[in-house]
Amino acid sequence: MTALKQTEKSTSLPMSFDFDIEGMTCASCVRRVEKAIAAVPGVASANVNLATERATVQFNGVPETTSVLRAVEKAGYAPRIVTEEIQIEGMTCASCVSRVEKALKAVPGVADASVNLATEKATVRLVSGSAEISALAAAVKGAGYGIRKATPAEAMKEDVDHRTAELRSLKSAVTISSLMTLPLFLLEMGSHFIPGVHDFIMGTIGMRNNLYLQFALATLVLFGPGLRFFRKGVPNLLRWTPDMNSLVVLGTTAAWGYSVVTTFVPAILPSGTANVYYEAAAVIVTLILVGRYLESRAKGRTSQAIKRLVGLQPKTAFVLHSGEFVETEITEVVTGDVIRIRPGEKIPVDGTVTDGSSYVDESMITGEPVPVQKATDSAVIGGTINKTGSITFKATKVGSDTLLAQIIRLVEAAQGSKLPIQALVDRVTAWFVPVVILAALLTFAAWYVLGPSPALSFALVNAVAVLIIACPCAMGLATPTSIMVGTGRAAELGILFRKGEALQSLRDADVVAVDKTGTLTKGRPELTDLVAAEGFEPDEVLCLVASLETLSEHPIAEAIVSAAKSRGIATVAVSAFEATPGFGVSGTVSGRRVLVGADRALVKNGIDITGFADEAERLGSGGKSPLYAAIDGRLAAIVAVSDPVKESTPQAIKSLHALGLKVAMVTGDNRRTAEAIAKKLGIDEVVAEVLPEGKVDAVRKLRQGGRSVAFIGDGINDAPALAEADVGIAVGTGTDIAIESADVVLMSGDLNGVAKALALSKATIRNIKQNLFWAFVYNISLVPVAAGVLYPVNGTLLSPIFAAAAMAMSSVFVLGNALRLKSFDPA
């Protein structure tokens, strides 16, 4: 993913700009950043994800990336700045340095660039996530110089380093805060747990010194470890855009400030209200810091799937140079390099085997546990593991072009997307924090006016509890964390969700429509029958038909040509070849006009096929696909091919039925053949004799009655139907997959992956609903309790300390629930 790219082929369509943001803590932050970005002229849309801490901005017209970054900073947040070191090739003088620096600084998202001629390195400071090496490389190449490509591991290392530093900082803050809060808590509340503590304090340091000591400890906690809340919360308050940090600041400052007045000028307070709440302020900060620490740890675990994918690629490869295999940095491997792989080693890049044979474990890519045999001309995938033999292969795709790199980009894109279910959360969080502040003010006023004596103390404590217990974080994390873990688990199972939205739409599917050839079947048909008409010799017909089919790319053509070769029948030259999709092929072979195709092709050309009606019925009833051959305008033969059903297909259909789905087969075969196959497999509906362009109409027909349709095909020939369906699922294997043609991609050819994807979709949406239910119920129920609605009933009041603990744990609960998807088992 480059920093700036067109979302479609047309240059008039919106451009996209991605970057990482620091400082967001809750759903209100997300709303605020999105609002700030959307206000920038030229911005078409802004999508900010709290879990990934990433923004995706689309522009209409000329992109104003600098204005977007300034808007984010003005809103109180910081685009994350990272440093990249890249090797520049071809520089010879200071002018080269200036030229390269200028080119790099022009890349959207680059804050600064410094180039060193002596080391031939460029140090680039850029907004994290906004520009990858590919974008920088394009700029340098445009200036006339070369650049060494980076690996995805480098970008991941930056993210890991950032999270490690954040965890270290939070751990330190929790430790310091706890060490100061514990004695403070004992000074104020110790007598409730340990008899004699109060008398001991009175007899040693006295009440006045006790208050001074509490003041000192609470102040150190608030403006030491707790300073992070003030740095973010106060500016947002001043901008009238409060967030969760603002709620913490208001609550703790109110408790601390009231206590300061009690300590130093108690005379100004009403009689009986001179109480201190230092321990509440300190414990609130400490508990929320603990929650942040646990939350940060959990967030790191949600992205482990991406880290594992990045970690699949080795750092070096043994490349053939001058007759010897030399260990080479992976960044220096180029297309065409010959690479040696020994048993147990990881395959570094995509390629084609040139020598040797082995079995390769591709489970980390396809989800299939059985090793795949590789021999000369076999394709190998970067990141997979060589098991037994030694092989040599030629690199065909390297760097960001490898299948592994594509998978990583797809998973990242899916994890950063928003589901339709998120819309409600966005609407609520837009006003959540301001409403909580208003609720706290109303709580204070109600208790001050209507509460028992001392009214001021009751008013303060309950208002602080309301401010502290409200948790927009849980609402903001509810959806994106489940998406992150769910799509990550899907990748481990060999399932790629190209769009996060497909997680929700797939769950709603009623009918699964399956293309027969290559999906239900192996896609490798075999010639089973050839019955010649009177006056024609079978071998003569096969020679003419096979010769014609050598120019066709259809799988059936390959079956006919292969059968001719196995019988020792040589093919001859063809002229005037013509292929009509859905009908057949025609041409001139040895001076004779030959036509091969479905019954409709011959009927269209006025050729009577009734002479083979009985044969056609027999072959079709056996699940074979009959074709006809005409020579010089006469019916010459009926040919039958059979495409074996995949071993996994029957179980896959049973699994889909078990999930409550109807299964429909869409095929170009005649109805008799299609129904025979459907009956054998237990398929519910059949749409037969469909031309390639008719698959879209077939999907529309299946959708009648308000049904949601998922269409499964090979992702290339079925592209229009995949696009028309509510969910398009492409089934492929390895590098043959057409990733861009569907919403969901199954990396293996096993149709059981569809049932796994559906089950995971249902589990993920269920997990999201659980999170949202918790987040909303938590806030709807506990905010009124914190305000004191139960006090008139049974005298219950919620301490600000318990409010802080509940708030801290609410986000951890959401993250913990989302992490359960890591162990999802579709079996």
UniProtKB/Swiss-Prot annotation:
The keyword Transmembrane applies. InterPro entries: ATPase_P-typ_cyto_dom_N (IPR023299), ATPase_P-typ_P_site (IPR018303), ATPase_P-typ_TM_dom_sf (IPR023298), ATPase_P-typ_transduc_dom_A_sf (IPR008250), HAD-like_sf (IPR036412), HAD_sf (IPR023214), Heavy-metal-associated_CS (IPR017969), HMA_Cu_ion-bd (IPR006122). The active site is at 515 (4-aspartylphosphate intermediate). It catalyses: Cu(2+)(in) + ATP + H2O = Cu(2+)(out) + ADP + phosphate + H(+). It is an enzyme of class 7 (translocase). It is a multi-pass membrane protein. Cu cation 1 binds at residues 26, 29. Keywords: ATP-binding, Cell membrane, Copper, Copper transport, Ion transport, Magnesium, Membrane, Metal-binding, Nucleotide-binding, Phosphoprotein, Plasmid, Repeat, Translocase, Transmembrane, Transmembrane helix, Transport. Gene3D superfamilies: 3.30.70.100, Calcium-transporting ATPase, cytoplasmic domain N, Calcium-transporting ATPase, cytoplasmic transduction domain A, HAD superfamily/HAD-like. Induction: Transcriptionally regulated by HmrR in response to Cu(+) ions. GO terms for biological process: copper ion homeostasis. It is found in: Cell membrane. Signal peptide: none annotated. It comes from the Bacteria. Its main location: membrane. CDD domains: HMA, P-type_ATPase_Cu-like. Residues 15-80, 82-148 form the HMA domain. One of its GO terms (molecular function) is ATP hydrolysis activity. The chain crosses the membrane at residues 174-194, 210-230, 248-268, 271-291, 430-450, 458-478, 541-561, 569-589, 727-747, 773-793, 795-815. Cu cation 2 binds at residues 93, 96. Belongs to the cation transport ATPase (P-type) (TC 3.A.3) family. Type IB subfamily. This is Copper-transporting P-type ATPase. The gene is actP.
